[in-house]
Design a protein with these regions (language model features):
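Extracytoplasmic catalytic/substrate-binding loops of multi-pass membrane glycan-assembly enzymes
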Residues: 1-12, 19-32, 117, 153-154
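Membrane-proximal lumenal/periplasmic loop motifs of glycosylation machinery
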Residues: 12-31, 43-47, 179-186
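Aromatic- and kink-enriched transmembrane "portal" helix at the membrane-lumen/periplasm boundary
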Residues: 27, 41, 45-53, 62-89, ...
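Membrane-water interface signatures at transmembrane helix termini and the short loops
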Residues: 83, 183-247
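Specific aromatic-rich, kink-prone transmembrane helix
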Residues: 86-109, 237-241
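Membrane-interface alpha helices of multi-pass inner-membrane proteins
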Residues: 92-95, 104-128, 218
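Membrane-lumen/periplasm interface segments of specific transmembrane helices
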Residues: 125-202, 210-214
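Signature aromatic-anchored transmembrane alpha helix within multi-pass, membrane-resident enzymes
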Residues: 131-140, 247-262
């Protein structure tokens, strides 16, 4: 029996009824997987594995496959009726295709990514450090203009969805400076942030790429009710920073710190 939080119940219902924004933007997986919980479970868990493998390719280090054990990934493993892991895996695959120069494939993949989750094209562009992949926001804009439904899943949820800034402030009040929520779930990957502060990271987009990835990860918390599973979309970029600046012998330690992190938290 898998967990079905409110978001999951929305996705399961989307093939037969309209749902509210932003969930109605994420229509591809609900259309294809429909109400089949087993199919959702397979899709999400295969995506978690793929994220580890793709990050290893992206960074050039097999040790960075350990990102699959970050708390955001393990939370989705146990709550698989979600679009996040498939979206992240797709964003990373799109970036890798773009980095190979196969734009004839990368651009259609970016467009498909925009139907999985509205943030997928943004993260594809960050991972590849190339703005062309933002073309994937076109289907997001088209879908945004289409009719959406109301939210009736909980008594208070409709108001939270209608007023996202209020929701973000409500759920993060007094928690912005909590290191157990905002920092320690990264484990050894936090070295990527230290590198950015030192200004010595010179791979791909360099410190600017790390900064943009962190901004794209943390700023949505202003309008979100979750934390870790949102900002850890930046994991591949921080992993790349670690591989770039740390000595080779330190990478297994980073991987072990991720897998056995005692301050990982629940991952939400």
């Amino acid at each position: 029996m898998v967990n079905l939080p409110p978001d999951s119940r929305r996705y399961l219902a989307m093939h037969k009824r309209r749902v509210c924004r932003p969930f109605h933007l994420r229509w591809l997986l609900p259309l294809t997987l429909r109400g089949n919980v087993k199919a959702w479970t397979w899709a999400t868990r295969l995506a978690v594995v793929a994220i580890g493998l793709l990050t290893a390719v992206y960074t050039g280090s097999p040790w960075m496959a350990a990102v699959a054990f970050l708390p955001a990934m393990t939370w989705n493993w146990h709550n698989p009726v979600m679009v996040d892991m498939v979206g992240m895996a797709w964003a990373l695959a799109t970036a890798l295709v773009a980095l190979e120069g196969w734009w004839w494939l990368a651009i259609p993949m970016a467009l498909v990514g925009g139907t999985i989750r509205e943030t997928v094209p943004v993260w594809s562009a960050i991972y590849a450090w190339h703005p062309v992949l933002l073309v994937g926001l076109v289907p997001v804009a088209v879908r945004w203009a289409m009719r959406h439904g109301s939210d009736t899943w909980t008594d208070h949820n409709a108001e939270l969805v209608a007023r996202p800034f209020m929701a973000g402030q409500l759920f993060h009040r007094g928690r912005w400076r909590d290191p157990l929520l905002m920092v320690t779930p990264w484990a050894g990957l936090i070295a990527g942030v230290v590198v950015m502060a030192g200004g010595v990271f010179d791979a791909r987009g360099g410190a600017a790429q790390v900064g943009v990835a962190l901004a794209a990860g943390y700023l949505p918390l202003l309008i979100a009710t979750d934390s870790v599973r949102i900002y850890q979309w930046a994991a591949p970029v921080l992993a790349l920073a670690c591989v770039t600046v740390l000595p080779t012998w330190a990478l297994p330690l980073v991987a072990l710190s991720i897998v056995f992190n005692p301050w990982r938290g629940p991952g939400t």
